[in-house]
Amino acid sequence: MEPGMEMNTASEGGTRRGPENKHEEKVQDPNRGEAETKAEMGNKTWADLAGEMKTFLWNPEERTCMGRTAKSWGLILLFYFIFYTCLAGMFAFCMYVMLLTLSPYTPTYRDRVSPPGVMIRPYLNGFTIAFNVSKPSTWQPYVDSMHQFLAAYDDKVQEEKNIECISGQYFIQGGNDSEEKKACQFKRSLLQNCSGIEDPTFGFSKGQPCILLKMNRIIGYRPGAGVPVNVDCKVQKGNESDLRSVDFYPGNGTFDLMYYPYYGKLTHVNYTSPLVAMHFTDVKRNSLVHIQCKLNGKGIINDVNSDRFLGRIIFTLSIGK
């Protein structure tokens, strides 16, 4: 082989090895860069990081706060102010339109309103009424609660605010929904022995307590379908002889129809719910007596076990000597 050819071959070989070396360098460069970057990051102190954070919060050279100039911050705040103002305005407008369709005097949908529940007075610490006849301090709170509750039923108050109505029929009042409705008188004297007039202790001092029962108010509701609803009481759990005698006032424990329907608190301002007083004149002493009092009448539901207040109420009497 001629010397010139050997030199060409050698030069060609060198040319071939050149790219291989360059490729090796290219492969090694990224690793070296990562190592150098890690080294640079590792060399930063907490002071350096704090300085960078300070510059981020306020850069005096570029006069920026968190990367934004005052003009940029002003524009973005103005954008969000306008955006949320429009959003709130749309929500308020939708609420306004919806409220225009609702009457403040009469509920729009009443087809699924259940019959009324009932409640008792006095109601202090739950549905257990316990006291000792010989210790006035045990029954005086119940007496005070009864007087406070019946203050709105005083005869003079009822005569001043309400009118006398025809018994035995619904008191239907026409006119606009916004017109103020009249209310029928319910005087506490109708409760007779349980009025607190003749006996200011409502029988508690004698071991013959009076319990008041009232129906919850439902706008437009007419109980009994033309027949007055009445109340009866019996022992709910235990011996029936534990409850030997109960007197009811007024009208043998009936809710007169003239107090219905109820038109709502906005128009029926002076309305006072009718009451039935239950005078427990003979109850077993020194024993817990579980009593159930319920409403009876057309359309009344009083047998739902999951709701102890729907058309009935269960409470406990404990009368000590």
Curated annotation (Swiss-Prot):
The chain crosses the membrane at residues 73-93. Pfam families: Na_K-ATPase. GO terms for biological process: potassium ion transport; proton transmembrane transport; regulation of DNA-templated transcription; sodium ion transport. The keyword Lipid biosynthesis does not apply. It comes from the Eukaryota. Residues 14-41 have a biased composition (Basic and acidic residues). PROSITE patterns: ATPASE_NA_K_BETA_1, ATPASE_NA_K_BETA_2. Residues 1-41 are annotated as: Disordered. It is a single-pass type II membrane protein. Residues 1-72 are cytoplasmic. Keywords: Disulfide bond, Glycoprotein, Hydrogen ion transport, Ion transport, Membrane, Signal-anchor, Transmembrane, Transmembrane helix, Transport. PANTHER family: PROTEIN ATP1B4, SODIUM/POTASSIUM-DEPENDENT ATPASE BETA SUBUNIT. This is the non-catalytic component of the active enzyme, which catalyzes the hydrolysis of ATP coupled with the exchange of Na(+) and K(+) ions across the plasma membrane. Composed of two subunits: alpha (catalytic) and beta (accessory). Belongs to the X(+)/potassium ATPases subunit beta family. Its function as a Na,K-ATPase beta-subunit will be lost in placental mammals. This is Protein ATP1B4. The lineage of its organism: Eukaryota, Metazoa, Chordata, Craniata, Vertebrata.
